[in-house]
Amino acid sequence: MDRLPGFRDFYPEPLPHKDVWSADARCYIFDTWKKIAHRYGFREYDGPPLEPLELYTLKSGEEIVGQLYNFTDKGDRNVSMRPEMTPTLARMIAAHERNYRKPIKWFSIPQLFRYERQQKGRLREHFQLNADIFGEASSSADAEIICLLIDILRAFGLTSEDFVIRLSSRRAWSEFFSKRCPDPSKAYEFYQIVDKLEREDPDVSKQKLAALGFSYEEVTAFIASGEPTEELKAILDNLSARGFADFVKVDYGVIRGLAYYTGPVFEAFDRKGHFRAIAGGGRYDNLTNLISGGKFDPASNTVKGGKVDIPSLGFGMGDVVLTELLKERGLLPAFSPSADVCVLIEDLGR
C-alpha cells in the first residue's frame, strides 16, 4: 500500500530510496532550530493538531480555508487539522496571557497540513518552526525576530551571499489600497493578487487588478519605489547596528498572503532564486483581539471589542524548502549509524 500523495516517510540513513526523506536530517534541523531559539530566550510550547474550524475561517483568509483538511467529528463538531500554528498560539495567549510576564517569547515545531497542489518546495504536510513575540509593540521586537531568523540560517552555514530578508509593510499597502478603493471588503482580495504578482502571468494579474479598479502599472510602480516607511527605517537601523545590514533589503513585492498581518512583513529567499520562500512572517497586532471576541472595524481598519488586545509578531520556517536548500549547497552533514559506547569482551581464561 502506498502512502498518501504529498506526505512523507522519514527513514534513518542510509536512505533506501530517493523518494523518502532523512529522519537524521530532520533531527539535525530541529535541534538547530531549538538551539538558536533557546539562545534568544524563547521557550517551547505546543498545541493540538486538531482545532475548531472557526479558528481558521475567522481571519486566516480564503486561500487557507480552501486548503483545509476539515470534517465533522463524532460529536458533530466542525473541526480541522491545523494548516498553520499562529491562530492556535493566539488562542492560547488570549486565554492565559495574564499568567506570563511580557514580552512572551515562545517557539514551536508543529506538523501542519494543507490540501494544495504539490510542487517544488510545497507538499501537503510539513514541519515548521514558529517563533513569536507577544506584548511588545516597539520596532526592537521586529528587529529581534528578524535577527533570530538570520542567526538560525547562519547556524546552518548560510551567509548573506546565500539568502536575503525582503522587508515590507502591510500598513503601507493598506494605505495604498484605501486611497484608491472605498470598499475595505476588497482589501484581502487585493493583497492576494499582489502576493502572487511574481508567480502569476502578468496578463492575468492585470485583469484581476483592473476588476478592483487598479492598474498594473501603478501597483508595480509602488513596488519599484522601495521607499521605507518610518517603522521600516527603525527596523533597518536596529539591524544595521547589530551588523546584519547585508542580510536585509526593503522590497514592497512582499505582502504576505495571510489576512491577519497588520504592520511590517518579511520573507527570506535564497539569492539564486532556486526555491520558494525559506521563511516568512510579520506583525499581526489584531489577532488576539479578534480571537477573544473582537470585530473588524472597516472605518479604522482595526479590530475592536475583544477581551484581550496584545501586540504580536512572529515568523514560520518550513522544513521542506530548508532541507532542499541545504542539500543543494552541500550543508547537510553526513549521517551514519554510530555507537555511543563500544564494549569489548575478552576471555582471560584462554
Residue ranges and their predicted role:
Residues 1-87, 95, 143, 164-166:
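TRNA-binding/sensing appendages of the translation machinery
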Residues 3, 18-22, 183, 198, ...:
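Intrinsic-disorder-associated interaction segments
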Residues 16-20, 188, 208:
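Short, low-complexity, intrinsically disordered N-terminal segments
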Residues 23-40, 51-54, 76, 86-100, ...:
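Positively charged, Gly/Ser-enriched RNA/tRNA-binding surfaces
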Residues 41-46, 70, 189-192, 217, ...:
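Compositionally biased, intrinsically disordered low-complexity regions enriched in proline and serine
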Residues 61-66, 159, 177, 181:
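Short alpha-helix boundary/capping motifs
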Residues 167-206:
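Short terminal or interdomain "cap/linker" segment that borders an active site or interface and mediates
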